Amino acid sequence: MVTHAMEEPKTFNIPTFVLDENCNFIPEVLSRANAKYIKDVLIQDSYNTVCLANSFIPMTIQTAEQIMVIITKFKFSRARDLFEKVLRLGVHINRFYAGKKQVKHMITMMKSLFDTEEAMRRLDRALMGLFVDARGSSYMPLIALSLHENGLPDSKFTKAVKLINTTLNSFHNRPDADIEQYAQKLRAYNYLYKIPHYTLKEAVDVYSENLKDLSIGVNKKPTLLFTSSDDGYLSHIFNDMLFLTSTWNMIYNCKVQIRRLTTWIKYEINSIVEDCVLVGFQLPDLKDTILDLAALTSNMNLVDPDKDLFSHYKLILEKLFEISIFATKANICILPTFIKSHLIEFEDVLKRSNDDEDLNYLLLKSNDSDDEYDEDKLPIQVDPGRVDNVLTDSNFFNVTADNAFSSIAIMPISYDKIIDVEENVIQVLEVEMQSLSAVVYGAVANKYGLSLPQVIKRLNQNEGRASSRASSSHSTSTIPYSPPQSGRSTPTSILRQRAPIRSNSRSSSVSFSQDDDNRSHYSDETNISDYSYPMADLDLEDEEPMEDHPHSPQSASSNNSMSRRSRALQNEQRRRTPTMAPPSPARGQNNARLRRRTRRSTETNDERL
């Protein structure tokens, strides 16, 4: 059956794509190691679609996006959200770099058709023969002067084709049978090419080879019918003029797509930087890498848009693949939107809290009862005229060099749990996160104009009252902090400044490691009030001995054996910890009234004296 299908005649040849190990990435854009990483992560059918979208065929950005169907293998699905964005960005950068070289080659080859005086005279004679009934009009100069890379946008191309079609009745030029369907072969190697109404199948065959050579990059002058023979048939001139105008229009649209890619790529890079910052809160070991990424992105944003940005794109893409590979090997679920949801929650709590309230208590408390769900309970009624969506605030989370990784008070804690599936060999690795395991305080503080020391102070001001579940002495650590700067300075100088801030928890270093079974060991089940991930280059003062801490180096060998015991101790500790209720608003009002009365009585006594 396959043999019979192969023997059937075809109206045109479908281009074959060589699926090499580089996924059609140019070596100047992406290294072989990163290309192999893409091939290892994607399933085969998805890999083929990426190769097609990343091929030499000129196409719009929308077409490339629709062609790519990114499906990762199941074992790599945890980092899929980040990997998909990085891969799409890489394809667009590759098309940007290859497209600029492709357009330059097309222009050179098309200009070589009439690079001599004799060739220009032949073009003049052809136009005069075609427009024999309109020699006194401006048709010929308008078309001849438009045959260059900037001369035929879609509007002028449509008018030029209409002018050429007006000459169709001046000579006997009957189209060949099924010419419209046959001409579709011209789109095989170029999705931006607009097919005019050709009349000769012979011309379509010649122009198809021309477009193939132009798209692939063959150093060969295109072939025209009226220049390849001494017979100046009007039908040949008619089809050649349609090819010239449509090809120059295609080149113009290629340049338009490259300009659009520039805007698209810059937007995508700035968007992915935000996701990478959120990923960094799940993987603190990536902090320095993401700081470098933020500096590279800031440099790119400061460059004049008219300058060539490919060198910036290449460095940024290398950093993004470094982060993506690290996140894939970490084997934890990468959820930037989950981290951002806690940003929104913390912002809401920050707006509604008072200065003397414990934010940790407000964030961790639950208003839901422990009873079973009551299906008869009516939902809370909200005014239908009210529109309040924090996600519509574009300035909510704007990652800049000033607030990227300025401080982290609570870091995400993830742990592995192996679930046996019906005593089978198959095991499911489930990664869970604490109910409130990651809050980016720096970004929220930056929005409200607060300093990081003020936010940390509010988080730690009640630690003396809550010290029953922690040790009486606390360590002081120096955490990197980048205060807002005025004036213009380099991103590196902004990102590398330091200022001391008091931490609310003990710190210990955690390094990335991976066992043979590819499991993550960032932490076991740990209470977030007793442990937080540190920043790099911490200076610890009077730190308590941590031999009893489940993550200390002394107890590294006994982590697995003590996981159940630590879980039981933590549950017992939570039950014993008293609930820290926020102060009553009425009590605060009474205190305020008492202070006002005292102040008035003091002022009265002063006046009497």
Swiss-Prot record:
Compositional bias annotation for Basic and acidic residues: 600-609
Keyword Phosphoprotein: yes
Disulfide-bond pairs as recorded: none
Annotated InterPro entries: Herpes_pp85
Places the protein is found: Virion tegument; Host cytoplasm
Modification note: Phosphorylated.
GO-annotated cellular components: host cell cytoplasm; viral tegument
Compositional bias (Polar residues): 484-495
Entries under Pfam families matching the protein: Herpes_pp85
Predominant location category: virion
Region annotated Disordered, chain positions: 461-609
Keywords: Host cytoplasm, Phosphoprotein, Virion, Virion tegument
Biased composition (Low complexity): 465-478, 503-513, 552-563
Similarity field: Belongs to the herpesviridae pp85 family.
Protein name: Phosphoprotein 85
Organism classification: Viruses, Duplodnaviria, Heunggongvirae, Peploviricota, Herviviricetes
Gene: U14
